A protein has these predicted regions:
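Acyl-donor (CoA/ACP) binding surface of acyl/acetyltransferases
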Residues: 1-29, 60-204
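Short, surface-exposed helix-loop/turn micro-motifs enriched in polar/charged residues
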Residues: 20, 34-35, 55
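Conserved GNAT-fold acetyl-CoA-binding loop/helix
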Residues: 27-49
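A short helix-loop-beta-strand connector motif used in the catalytic cores of GNAT acetyltransferases and
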Residues: 38, 48-62, 70
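Short, P/G- and charge-enriched loop/turn segments at secondary-structure junctions
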Residues: 47-51, 178-181
Length: 204
């Protein structure tokens, strides 16, 4: 599926280099209980849980910059430097570049959507654009589901804003429900978001 700037394609092993570029960064992955991936093999193993052979019910997409997008569109708006200050930003923000991932990493007991983007893309609106496109795809591909959920650390304002912009509503705040050993405090609070199918109906 294409948007004005993005191309969402099914995540495959071919996307491992871009996936590893994101998951090898401790700062980008600091909100994940999994933590960063130290080696390419670590990223390969972590990504395998999103692929159809292991996760047949998952709906998981690589988010790429459209190959036909003029690089000047990005450069003119944000300058030649990387917005996130990462040295790999120039390589990522090129036509066809792997920007991030969005998908349902698990479906039981209910489908849960997650997303993560290379830090050079932060602040450019790609996450919101990708999640909106993903929702359109998900509701078509999984008519049996009435809703999607997402869990976000209470201090992760950027991700919370993305989910809210895309129609997710806060259900509850769960106090001290998980741990991030590299954060202060280690015991974390999480926000439980939910989005309903737009037409409010499910398959019969």
């Amino acid at each position: 599926m294409q948007t004005s700037r993005l191309n969402l394609v099914r995540l495959t092993e071919d996307h491992l280099p871009g996936y590893h570029a994101i998951w090898s960064d401790p700062f980008t992955t600091r909100w994940s209980p999994h933590g960063h991936c130290a080696t390419l093999d670590d990223s390969r193993e972590w990504m395998s849980g999103l692929l159809p052979d292991v996760n047949p019910k998952g709906v998981n997409y690589a988010v790429l910059l459209r190959a036909d997008l003029d690089p000047g569109v990005i450069q003119a708006r944000h300058g030649s430097g990387s917005p996130g200050g990462d040295g790999d930003g120039d390589a990522v923000l090129q036509p066809g570049g792997f920007l991030g991932y969005v998908g349902t990493w698990k479906s039981e007991p209910e489908p849960e959507v997650g997303l993560i983007f290379h830090r050079s893309t932060w602040g450019l609106g790609f996450a919101t654009e990708a999640l909106n496109a993903f929702l359109e795809l998900f509701w078509k591909e999984r008519p049996e589901f009435e809703h999607l959920v997402a869990w976000v650390d209470e201090e992760n304002a950027a991700s919370s804003n993305v989910f809210r912009k895309c129609g997710f509503h806060l259900v509850e705040t769960c106090k001290g429900d998980y741990t991030l050993k590299w954060m202060v405090p280690e015991l974390r609070n999480s926000l439980h978001f939910r989005a309903r199918r737009p037409d409010g109906t499910t398959a019969t």
